[in-house]
Amino acid sequence: MQAGLRIDVDTYRGTREGVPRLLDILDEAQVKATFFFSVGPDNMGRHLWRLVRPTFFWKMLRSNAASLYGWDILLAGTAWPGKPIGRDLGPLMRRALDAGHEIGLHAWDHHGWQANAGHWSDRQLTAQIHRGVDCLSDILGHPVVCSAAAGWRADQRVVQAKEAFGFRYNSDCRGASLFRPLLADGSLGTAQIPVDLPTFDEVIGPHLKPDAFNDYILGRFAARQLNVYTLHAEVEGIIMADGFRQLLKRANTQGIHFAPLGHLLPDAIERLPSGHIVRGHLPGREGWLGVQQ
């Protein structure tokens, strides 16, 4: 059973500490994945103002966020300027590339995108993508081939903005199957590879403890579905690293074979069905996100 393995890298600490550990774990398991990197300033601590929202406050309590992520991540970019991730830690991104993993853009400013993508102008959306693409392509030494919107904050405007960058595919939404979004002019856009499996932080809480997560998530894979799983360098690369190592071992025993997302694309991309990305909601995740329709 083939499955896509996606690793989102949102923060400075996730890049500095989580990525090297994940690369070692993946090398041990002989597994390749897709890394989506945030490359601009780490301003993730600015999400703390969202604690006034009951859904976000409950998510932080449910996942025990301070223990899960660490205070340096939760406070990054609040009382001081956010550290420039790509400028300081670009060699770790090249290390992932040299190890044979697929590399794509997550965001220039992860917090900025997640907080503002829903109301930025078309020009602002394009400028944010442009900054991220320019930075990551300079780091890698070649064009960026894929992207994944931070926090799955994507809709048809985001889809349209990304068309100018010539990506091979995007992974901007939650959904159940590969598709090509229908654009405003009636043409079909860049292929989308949705995520169909929940993330660790979406399901951990009073009814599911961390040590039971592997049983839960491995039970969600099925032969007749997409099977795209997302992990975070800030979680599975740090505090839950041992759990991820065991997940890979058990997945292999169950016949689940992980691969970079790009390997899920068919040879004839033009034959993929059409679809849309609309704003929706998902249990365990605060705020809106892009969903396949």
UniProtKB/Swiss-Prot annotation:
Residues covered by the NodB homology domain: 1-259
Keyword Iron-sulfur: no
Key word Lipid metabolism present: yes
Range of residues in the leader sequence: none
Enzyme Commission designation: 3.5.1.n3
Gene Ontology molecular function: hydrolase activity, acting on carbon-nitrogen (but not peptide) bonds, in linear amides
A biological-process GO annotation: 4-amino-4-deoxy-alpha-L-arabinopyranosyl undecaprenyl phosphate biosynthetic process
Pathway entry: Glycolipid biosynthesis; 4-amino-4-deoxy-alpha-L-arabinose undecaprenyl phosphate biosynthesis; 4-amino-4-deoxy-alpha-L-arabinose undecaprenyl phosphate from UDP-4-deoxy-4-formamido-beta-L-arabinose and undecaprenyl phosphate: step 2/2; Bacterial outer membrane biogenesis; lipopolysaccharide biosynthesis
NCBIfam families: PRK15394.1
Function: Catalyzes the deformylation of 4-deoxy-4-formamido-L-arabinose-phosphoundecaprenol to 4-amino-4-deoxy-L-arabinose-phosphoundecaprenol. The modified arabinose is attached to lipid A and is required for resistance to polymyxin and cationic antimicrobial peptides.
Protein name, as recorded: Probable 4-deoxy-4-formamido-L-arabinose-phosphoundecaprenol deformylase ArnD
Organism: Pseudomonas syringae pv. syringae (strain B728a)
Biological classification of the source: Bacteria, Pseudomonadati, Pseudomonadota, Gammaproteobacteria, Pseudomonadales
